[in-house]
Amino acid sequence: MKLLAIISASLALAGFTTATPPPQTFSIKAKGNPKVPSARFDASRSNIFLNYGDSGAVCEVKPGCPKPKDAVFYLKDSILYLYTGSSNPVQKVFLDRSGFGQGKIGYLTGDGQLPSRWEVQGWTIDGAGNLKFKGKGLIACPTSDPKIKSWTVWADLGIATPGGNKGCLPFTAHTMKTKPVACKYT
């Protein structure tokens, strides 16, 4: 009994701490609409895209290993985060369902104050592995530049042309477990 107390006290004095395991990370793919290609989610320039290409993210990968092609996310307390690891500032996904934002989805770096109309809490993954915001799905809108083949991601609020975008289509945002590779997104 005394030996156990001595060991416990020694560990406490030595600053022994247990490492926090990384959160369950996942990538997201667009599925369920034949007009929206089975596309990966990318994060760049504070926006969420489908098939954006090189996002410019700086990732912590082992030498000889490629950086992830998809953005890496995790969910905590119904807030959707980009996985940045412990050495980068937090990056959390927001949604603006106001008349001004019309379902705009993006992400912010840091833990600063959010504008009052932006929401971060309300994300869930259903039993089939599909990501939703307060029970609603997502839509994709093709970019207006014909040279760019990516799509912007919006919340499905029943608005056919959010932000003035045309050709927007609903899809299922399906999550898939992935390795926790820390990246800082631009």
Curated annotation (Swiss-Prot):
Q: Where in the cell is it found?
A: Secreted; Secreted, Cell wall
Instruction: Assign the protein's first listed, main location to one coarse class.
Output: secreted
- What drives induction of this protein's expression? Expression is down-regulated in presence of human keratinocytes.
> Which key words tag this protein in UniProt?
Allergen, Cell wall, Secreted, Signal, Sporulation
Summarizing the function annotation, the protein's role is:
Cell wall protein involved in development of asexual structures such as phialide and conidium development, and thus required for spore formation. Plays a role as a general stress protectant produced by the fungus in competition with antagonistic bacteria.
Q: Which family does it belong to?
A: Belongs to the phiA family.
- Its protein name is Cell wall protein phiA
Species: Arthroderma benhamiae (strain ATCC MYA-4681 / CBS 112371) (Trichophyton mentagrophytes)
Q: What is the lineage of its organism?
A: Eukaryota, Fungi, Dikarya, Ascomycota, Pezizomycotina
* Originating gene: phiA
